[in-house]
Amino acid sequence: ALSDLSSVVSYKDIYESVTSLNLSIYTPSLFIFDSKREKYMGTSHNKGNMTQSGRERGVRKLMSINLLKRLESSVNSFVLTLSRIKELIDHTIQTIDHFKRNGLTKLDMYDVSENDFDIDDTNNDFVVGKKVQIDLADVDIKSWREELAADSENIGILLFMLKEVTPKHDKKLQTLLEMINNKITNPINPNNKKIIIFSAFADTAMYLYDNIAPYVQEKFGLH
């Protein structure tokens, strides 16, 4: 379970929500009108002969997988990534709406945060690269906006349901604190007071430190 609170969404429900996301925020080139595709054929920031649309599909797949990795790492990391994705989606929707009112607008086709990927994924060809711009006049903005809005709504619901999972109700964190308490109370080596915890994500490591450090200092006088 994610939390000791029975009202909190389950891992199964989160998995189903994540895998049902369109994540079309990362695939704008799929919505380019056929008549305009040639204009972007040479547009790429890739290695080898990977097309922009191919790269975008790769990023979308990586992000979907990585969201689940983030959840496995900590609910805190998962919420941070979901919030960043929603912010990007909402900004893009605002840009589309601005275009509908005022006309010409260019939009960055590519925007991912390396903080949301583990070390292995940041070395992937899909992630490394610079932004490329797309003219919204060349895009089926109606279809794209519909998918973006659906994702924004679903992510918003997920974030709302996860608000209750504070550190006090984070079951994974509380289980870790119990393990630390047991190790310190019943040490194999009484002279070894170090606590070493590994994580693939820097923000998970910081989240754990921020919650473990005051706990062991208050309870055991350790720094």
Question: Residue spans of the language-model regions?
Answer:
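Helicase motor interdomain insertion/brace
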Residues: 1-223
